């Protein structure tokens, strides 16, 4: 099994992800090769909480251009993790 810190890359802080905090849902960018079971175990191990549900999605990178040179931001995988009632992740508190 992979190290949990390799599975969870970073939290996502956007207007939409902040509104999901009211429903006890937290959003992370995760390793694209990780499956839902690995993501669940990583969140439970790192933050010491119980996970009810994990939704994942692959996000395509955007087309960018610097002067006349076209490029693309990398694709990534995003996970929305729903925690058990009463559990919280302190990292997201105060947002």
From Swiss-Prot:
Taxonomic path: Bacteria, Bacillati, Bacillota, Clostridia, Eubacteriales
InterPro entries from the UniProt entry: Nucleotide-bd_a/b_plait_sf, Ribosomal_uL23-like, Ribosomal_uL23/eL15/eS24_sf
Protein name in the entry: Large ribosomal subunit protein uL23
Keyword Ribonucleoprotein assigned: yes
UniProt key word Ribonucleoprotein: yes
Keywords tagged on the record: Ribonucleoprotein, Ribosomal protein, RNA-binding, rRNA-binding
Role this protein plays: One of the early assembly proteins it binds 23S rRNA. One of the proteins that surrounds the polypeptide exit tunnel on the outside of the ribosome. Forms the main docking site for trigger factor binding to the ribosome.
Entry GO CC: ribonucleoprotein complex; ribosome
Example GO BP: translation
Subunit text: Part of the 50S ribosomal subunit. Contacts protein L29, and trigger factor when it is bound to the ribosome.
Similarity-based family: Belongs to the universal ribosomal protein uL23 family.
Domain of life: Bacteria
One Gene Ontology term of the molecular function aspect: structural constituent of ribosome
SUPFAM superfamilies, per the entry: Ribosomal proteins S24e, L23 and L15e
